[in-house]
Design a protein with these regions (language model features):
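Class I S-adenosyl-L-methionine
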Residues: 1-97, 104-105, 266-269, 273, ...
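Short alpha-helix immediately C-terminal to the canonical SAM-binding loop
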Residues: 279-280, 352
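Active-site capping/gating segments
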Residues: 181-196, 351, 358-402
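A contiguous loop/helix-start segment that scaffolds small-molecule binding in enzyme catalytic cores
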Residues: 2-7, 13-21, 66-68, 138-223
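Conserved SAM-binding loop of SAM-dependent methyltransferases across substrates and taxa
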Residues: 253-265
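Class I SAM-dependent methyltransferase SAM-binding "motif I" and its flanking Rossmann-like core
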Residues: 3, 9-12, 74-137, 302-303, ...
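Conserved class I S-adenosyl-L-methionine
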Residues: 243-252
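S-adenosylmethionine
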Residues: 274, 295-376
Length: 406
């Protein structure tokens, strides 16, 4: 039998719609948070939420021939259990009936239009992920981990330059114990909150802005870094979009992957490098920027390309920032999905010759990027050039000679 995943609010079991009430009355097994157990039908087997939640699939298998109802907070398809179950079981594998979510209630209490709010979750996720949704004038709603979350968020906001942000904790939304606590991040006075709450953050006008391409100074690196001006061009060509998959070959500090993920919600970037120290650095940079979806992949494409790549999903985009060779370029072209884009950079004459040859043979767009910055020269200033970068962009299509921008 298909399990039912029903949303429930702090108003409790009695506030559930008639359809859900009827299903509860006939259920053989009900999974719900402990605070709802006393109001559930006594004839059914009552289970707590499984920890870890992945154990839910063992319960589903055990009760596959029985009527099973899962009560989840708010809208189960919005950062909830429903999304996980549908992803695993398929849309036909379970039935979902949503309730008003805590996020919606919080927005209503604060008078923030939902369409203008950014949503983040730190429930079972790193606190650093919050950083990716912060910017001047942003209105952010945060799904908390527990009662200690607001204090941790306030501390993090101060560390990140958002100490002037207004914070609102809306606890037990929709229930008889609903409460609201407010203050600035830099003067947050509340150490412990009720476990069920939503955090609202209102960033001030003077909050730091990063932009779509992060400054070089935000990346720990040993010099193997695609500089910001050049990275901006690469990102424009890679064209990130929600849930896009990037292969970042020769990932170095991970800067291209990180900026790609910042522009691709739900995306994944696979940083491929033979140097595990570089991958550790890239992973740390991803965490510092608050992006999820970065996966380090250790391996040498020159020695065992299939072993390195065979378990990775087909990429929508490939960036080659290091280790340019005929073999790597050919491999990237073959592995790209139809319609995908390949962007490769070269700074040496040898690697540039590889890109020129690839451009001559398979088309695309060949560009040379030369950047100069004003630097002191004695008591004056002059233009100090960076090494020019040759950039080759190639779109994979059905023809034998694909030309970008043709």
């Amino acid at each position: 039998m298909r399990p039912l995943v029903a949303g429930v609010t702090e108003a409790g079991i009695t506030a559930l719609p008639n359809l859900v009430q009827e299903r509860l009355a006939k259920a053989d097994c009900i999974i719900a948070a402990t605070r709802f157990h006393a109001d559930l039908p006594s004839h059914a087997k009552i289970l707590n939420w499984p920890i870890p939640f992945s154990n839910i699939f063992n319960i589903l298998e055990e009760h596959s021939k029985q009527s099973l109802v899962i009560l989840a907070t708010g809208d189960p398809m919005w950062f909830g259990a429903g999304a996980t179950l549908v992803r695993q079981l398929g849309a036909e594998g379970c039935e979902v009936i949503p309730a008003v979510s805590g996020l919606q209630l919080a927005a209503a209490r604060l008078g923030w239009p939902m369409a203008n709010c950014r949503i983040a979750s730190i429930h079972g996720r790193p606190l650093e992920q919050l950083r990716s949704v912060l910017s001047p004038r942003a209105r952010v709603l945060v799904i908390a981990q527990d009662g200690a979350s607001p204090k941790a968020v306030a501390t993090a906001l101060c560390d990140w330059g958002y100490g002037a942000a207004d914070m609102h904790v809306l606890a037990n939304l929709g229930g008889s114990q609903e409460a609201r606590f407010s203050g600035t991040a830099s003067h947050w006075q509340h150490d412990r909150m009720p476990d069920f709450h939503i955090i609202g953050i209102a960033c001030d006008d003077a909050a730091p802005a990063i932009g779509p391409v992060a400054p070089d100074s935000r990346f720990e690196n040993d010099g193997k870094l695609t500089k910001r001006d050049v990275r901006a061009s690469a990102l424009a060509k890679l064209a990130p979009f929600p849930q896009a998959v990037l292969w970042d070959i020769g990932t170095g500090s991970g800067a291209v992957s990180i900026d790609f993920l910042r522009a691709a919600p739900g995306g994944r970037a696979y940083g491929i490098d033979r140097n595990s120290v570089q991958l550790d650095r890239a992973t740390a940079n991803a965490g510092m920027h608050g992006v999820s979806g970065f996966e380090p992949v250790t391996g040498d494409l020159a020695d065992s390309p299939n072993k390195v790549l065979d378990n990775l999903p087909v990429p929508d985009a490939v960036f080659v920032g290091g280790g340019v060779s005929v073999e790597v370029v050919t491999l990237a072209q073959a592995r790209l999905r139809p319609g995908g884009v390949l962007v490769a950079h070269a700074v040496t004459i040898e690697s540039e010759s590889v890109l020129i040859s690839a451009w001559q043979q398979t088309g695309g767009d060949l560009t040379r990027i030369a950047v100069q910055h004003a630097d002191p020269v004695g008591g004056f200033h002059g233009w100090r050039p960076l090494m020019p970068v040759t950039q080759w962009t190639w779109l994979k299509g059905s023809g034998e000679n694909d030309r970008c921008g043709a």
